[in-house]
UniProtKB/Swiss-Prot annotation:
Naturally occurring in which organism (per UniProt): Helicobacter pylori (strain HPAG1)
Record InterPro entries: G_ENGA, GTP-bd, GTPase_Der, KH_dom-like, KH_dom-like_a/b, P-loop_NTPase, Small_GTP-bd
Listed name of the protein: GTPase Der
Domain EngA-type G intervals: 9-171, 200-371
Lineage: Bacteria, Pseudomonadati, Campylobacterota, Epsilonproteobacteria, Campylobacterales
One GO process term, biological-process aspect: ribosome biogenesis
PANTHER family: GTPASE DER
Residues binding GTP 1: 15-22, 62-66, 123-126
Family: Belongs to the TRAFAC class TrmE-Era-EngA-EngB-Septin-like GTPase superfamily. EngA (Der) GTPase family.
Amino acid sequence: MNTSHKTLKTIAILGQPNVGKSSLFNRLARERIAITSDFAGTTRDINKRKIALNGYEVELLDTGGMAKDALLSKEIKALNLKAAQMSDLILYVVDGKSIPSDEDIKLFREVFKINPNCFLVINKIDNDKEKERAYAFSSFGMPKSFNISVSHNRGISALIDAVLSALNLNKIIEQDLDADILESLENNALEEETKEEEIIQVGIIGRVNVGKSSLLNALTKKERSLVSSVAGTTIDPIDETILIGDQKICFVDTAGIRHRSKILGIEKYALERTQKALEKSHIALLVLDVSAPFVELDEKISSLADKHSLGIILILNKWDIRYAPYEEIMETLKRKFRFLEYAPVITTSCLKARHIDEIKHKIIEVYECFSKRIPTSLLNSVISQATQKHPLPSDGGKLVKVYYATQFATKPPQISLIMNRPKALHFSYKRYLINTLRKEFNFLGTPLILNAKDKKSAQQN
């Protein structure tokens, strides 16, 4: 969120010692910042932290417990009342397992008098049966209170919604979100990318006798893989590593795949080994024989890349003896493999080693896209613009809204949309968003996984 033109909204957490103030602070901050224990008065200083609540930047204050008999109680109380006066909203936390004391009510009313923008938060209501205990706090005189359990993560989502509403933050445009704050929303799901060199794992797939072994030999310039016109020569996956610049690439020549009705004995074993090899791969080279028309099995084999969420490059082999003109083959390819429209296409003749260097460099380019991570602020800006250009369809007349987006994984890129009604995200609108992201960020040859979650699921994950 760009805060140059506005002051951050401040939320102060107040209450007596050992009611769960620091635990609530940690829960909202999504980090273990404040020390928590069963010993009253653990927090003495005011912990201050910029945090994000569903994508909105606020400043959160965790104050010391205001116990009458505590050491330095006068100083702590004075500091807390000053924090209350300067805050936009106060969360006054009480222990739902205890009977309200006169001292607690007196302190609350003193705080409320200084700043009436105050929520009564009743903590430690761990289940529905304990809700009855919350009625005892009606003596505080608040028309509405919030029953929560920080330790069980109950009621937190509703509290956050109410806080955002009270601070009028639900009117802020999502594209105004600050990149650093949004990074914290990923909740450490996306580990920091390792700087160690990684070998790109490439699986070569295709039906029997389309030229996979010839392609491996051309790529590695070795006769490592036996080449024969006899179908099914390759049984075990064969791997070979090469170096392009300073990047290592490991190729796996998998067993050719034929119709299931013809898979017997050792070929069934070979298919299982192929599946296991692909589980470890980053990119698939789908080899298609263009000396004859494509067959249904080609399409089925291509689904292996989707099944294992691999980057993919289409290799049209035997181009020197292609069965039809360029335009006709490309039109057929587009029609039969329309779900792979994002995949680059390279024509080659493996036996004559044509366009082999192009394949090598394309592998590196696709891997860079496969490993890509979008800056969170930029991601939200693009999503916001897309939803403004074409608003989300309503869900039975009810508004459907994307609160924010976050990329939580790479290889392949995986993005979550945090929404008020995630189940209402239609597949056609999801496809529109994916196409928008592809156009904006160039995910060449890379599957892009987009899912929708509600705020509660996002917080739990």
